[in-house]
Each structure stands twice: as structure tokens, then as C-alpha cells.
From Swiss-Prot:
Keywords: Bacterial microcompartment, Cobalamin, Cobalt, Lyase. This is Ethanolamine ammonia-lyase small subunit. It catalyses: ethanolamine = acetaldehyde + NH4(+). GO terms for molecular function: cobalamin binding; ethanolamine ammonia-lyase activity. One of its GO terms (cellular component) is ethanolamine degradation polyhedral organelle.
Amino acid sequence: MDRQIPTPENPWLALRNLTPARIALGRSGISLPTSAQLDFQFAHAQARDAVHLAFDHTALSEQLKERGRDSLVLHSAASDRNQYLQRPDLGRRLNERSVEQLRQHAKTNPGGCDLAIVVADGLSALAVHRHTLPFLARFEEQAAADGWTSAPVVLVEQGRVAVADEVGQLLGARMTVMLIGERPGLSSPDSLGLYFTYAPKVGLTDAYRNCISNVRLEGLSYGMAAHRLLYLMREACRRQLSGVNLKDEAEVHTIDSENTSNQKGNFLLGEG
């Protein structure tokens, strides 16, 4: 006669409310339950789709125009998606036509600008489609109060982070902010990354950039991301640097932070 073997209580179960990570999924014998396996396969498919989704720069350009913002549509040196994925170096530079387009814009608009905002598909065009406009609405509203001048929003197809350095250099921008789709995770196919650089020029390494990651509804809010970015920009202008020598020390007071600031112990274990 078959006897049901009791399953021991999973001590990780209580932590599922604190993270979207795949923990405490349960088991069927030595395998995952069917529901957990199907969820994993669905999330993996979403991540793959996000990587290969085409960047709809035409729609984004029209939406920016409706909000009173001009834009320039450029292309990296990577000719297509396959080359972009196989040759990261080509995604860091503009193609010749785009370089000439920026040079012509700089000639007709001499004097440079304080800020160049660059938007690239990166590894998740889905993130750019979902979060660019809501974030810019929060960010530019606050940035305008500081009196910074901005170039048209630059949309780069098949672009990587460093392509913003070339854009900023050609436009004569004092600062660049890159909005780019981050590498999709199994719980975050639409995560937007922000990369800030002071005095951009071709050849800078990641050490000269500041990153604000996981901007999305389930991650870092648009308002919080804008607050942190503006702090970095103000400090960069004051100290004339960015990257590893510029730390994000922006103070953000929330109800949760005030309630937990005096607590001791490990919150995961229910201490304090």
C-alpha cells in the first residue's frame, strides 16, 4: 500500500513576499512542480522576445513630438540585430551617415548644450517603449527648473551605452544621459537603465559613467530615478567629474525608511 510521504515545511516560503526571485517553488519528488516549470519557460520566452523586439523609433519620435520635443533618429555601426549581438564594439559607435547628421545639426545650432539625452534599444526595446516617456516627463520637468539647455532627444537604433559618448561629443554637450534597455532577466524583461556621463567623448570607459538601473514599475520608480539622476548631474557640474569618483548620496526620505532607520537586526529573519 502506497504511503504519502509528508513534505517538510519550506523555511524560504515567508520570503516570497519580499522578492520576485524564484525561491520556495515547491517540488514534486526531485523535480519542480508543473506550474513552476511553466512559469519559468514563459519568463524565459519573454526575455528572448525582449532581446529581439524591433525598436519602434518612429512611434517614439511621434510621441516626443506631441510633447513638444524634437528628436534625431540615428543608427549605430551595427547593421542589424545579429551583428549587434555578435559585435558589441559596433554598437558603441555611430555609422557614417549618423555622424554626418550630428555634425550638420551642430553647425546649424552652434554653442553646444548642457545636456544630450540619448535613447537606445540596447538589449530590451520593450523597456524603452514602456518607460522612456513616463520617465522623461518626470525628469525633464525637474531639470527645466535648473535651467539646463538640452539638445533634441537622440534615438539610436542598435545602440550600446558608449554610443552616447560620441553623440555628446559631436553635439558639444556638457553631459549625456543614456536611456537604454537592460539585459532581460527572468523576472524583468522591461528594465530600463540610465547611464550618466560628464564631459563625454569617444574612448571613455565605464569608470567614467554612473548607472541607475532597474527603472520600471516593479523596480525603481520614475520619480526616484529622476531624483537620483538630478543629484548626480548637480554634483557632476559642481565637481566636474562623473563615474567612480562621484557617488550617489542623494537622500530620499520615505515612510518606510523612517520606520526602519532605528531598527536593528536582520529583517529577513524577523529580528529587531
